[in-house]
């Protein structure tokens, strides 16, 4: 019940704004309803996966993804190829049902791991004020990751699909396939970097909390940073080899698929493979900055990524379409360098960062979101009292 109280504001606000867009977008009633349904499911799924990754239930997430993929493909094939349903509506309905299955699966897992609690469902708003830089880090990272796609929709290669729906198929398709080349880094961060680095990280910080001697702290720091440097170097090398392999082999494989790849799309693909590879390694460094609670450095790197990618993409619109994608490549390279230099500067004097930069007196931040949480808690308490009074009157 409390899960839905948290999701309710997101669903109401998000669906209201997206619903207004759909009303003027030119989509049919059925298409609009399916898009709105899918949008609402994605809100629940995104929040659910955030909690499930926090408790590291990767098997549950994998099973929900596999079940959703199987249902989407199976139902899509049945509706479109066997029953002859319209392709757009049939595939959109299939995807919606697949994500619906994922939503139900994730909610069941959430209720299994997080049973009913007496705590207020609005407590998380207090943490928003404390960790607001994380929200801006995520926002800037996503802006840098997707702004180049949106900007090219308005360029010479952009097409109007229908109403307010735009795209750039010659660029979007290579971008989607190139993005898959960074899966090795995403997986490597979980199974290698976190597995090998986190124990050293935990031992180092436990010495500060448990009264470790200076010699042990220095030794633990050297071991931790050595493991970190090794894992980051291996991550970069794995992504380099993966990117080189994909660029070398994908040209032949992509020509075998009915995707309509031409020389221009192959050029976009190669450029974006390098760009996404740099982004993947830079994002790994960004996550390590968050490990060390360097929220300022993380926001700085993410902001540079968002601003540079957008600016370089706008600049590339002035040149020939063959140069599209280099704006994202330049922004990703700058993001990687800024994040790496920040991590090097931060870890160069780590004991001072851990001890000297902490506030002497504990600070309690009560800003907008905290006050909003207190207000909602009071409203819940007021509603609960009114409910109890009504129940008492009915019993009398």
Where are these regions (language model features)?
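Short runs within selected transmembrane alpha-helices of multi-pass transporters and secretion channels
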Residues: 34-54, 91-104, 250, 267-292, ...
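Membrane-water interface segments that mark the loop-to-transmembrane alpha-helix transition
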Residues: 1-19, 207-246
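Hydrophobic alpha-helical transmembrane segments
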Residues: 64-110, 322-345
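Transmembrane helical elements of multi-pass membrane transporters/channels
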Residues: 94-194
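Alpha-helical transmembrane segments of multi-pass membrane proteins
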Residues: 4-48, 240-248, 258-285
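Short, highly charged, low-complexity non-transmembrane loops/tails of multi-pass membrane proteins
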Residues: 200-212, 350-389
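Helix-loop junctions and terminal segments of transmembrane helices
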Residues: 1, 184-215
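Small-residue-rich segments of transmembrane alpha-helices in multi-pass membrane proteins
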Residues: 12, 63-77, 125-133, 303-310, ...
């Amino acid at each position: 019940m409390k899960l839905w109280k948290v999701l309710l504001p997101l669903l109401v606000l998000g669906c209201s704004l997206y619903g207004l867009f759909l009303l003027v977008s030119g989509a049919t009633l059925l298409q609009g309803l399916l898009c709105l349904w899918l949008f609402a499911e994605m809100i629940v799924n995104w929040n659910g996966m955030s909690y499930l990754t926090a408790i590291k239930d990767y098997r549950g997430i994998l099973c929900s993804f596999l079940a959703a993929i199987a249902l989407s493909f199976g139902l899509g094939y049945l509706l479109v190829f066997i029953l002859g349903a319209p392709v757009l509506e049939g595939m959109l309905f299939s995807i919606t049902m697949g994500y619906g299955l994922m939503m139900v699966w994730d909610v069941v897992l959430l209720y299994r791991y997080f049973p009913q609690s007496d705590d207020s469902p609005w407590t998380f708003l207090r943490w928003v004020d404390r960790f607001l830089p994380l929200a801006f880090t995520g926002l800037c990272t996503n802006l840098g990751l997707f702004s180049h796609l949106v900007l090219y929709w308005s360029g010479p290669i952009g097409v109007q699909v229908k109403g307010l729906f735009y795209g750039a198929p010659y660029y979007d398709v290579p971008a989607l396939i190139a993005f898959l080349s960074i899966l090795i880094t995403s997986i490597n961060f979980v199974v290698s970097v976190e597995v090998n680095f986190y124990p050293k990280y935990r031992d180092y910080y436990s010495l500060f909390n448990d009264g470790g001697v200076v010699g042990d702290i220095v030794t633990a720091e050297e071991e931790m940073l050595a493991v970190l440097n090794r894992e980051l170097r291996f991550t970069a090398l794995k992504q380099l080899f993966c990117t080189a392999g994909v660029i070398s082999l994908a040209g032949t494989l992509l020509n075998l698929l009915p995707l309509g790849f031409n020389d221009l799309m192959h050029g976009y693909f190669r450029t974006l493979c390098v760009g996404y590879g740099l982004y993947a390694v830079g994002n790994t460094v960004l996550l390590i900055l968050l490990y060390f609670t360097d929220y300022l450095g993380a926001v700085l790197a993410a902001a540079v990524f968002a601003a540079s990618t957008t600016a370089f993409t706008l600049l590339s619109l002035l040149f020939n379409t063959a140069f599209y994608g280099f704006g994202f490549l330049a922004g990703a390279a700058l993001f990687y360098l800024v994040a790496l230099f920040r991590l090097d500067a931060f870890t160069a004097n780590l004991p001072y960062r851990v001890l000297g930069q902490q506030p002497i007196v504990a600070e309690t931040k009560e800003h907008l979101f905290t006050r909003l949480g207190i207000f909602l808690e009071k409203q819940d308490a007021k509603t609960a009292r009114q409910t109890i009074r009504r129940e008492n009157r009915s019993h009398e």
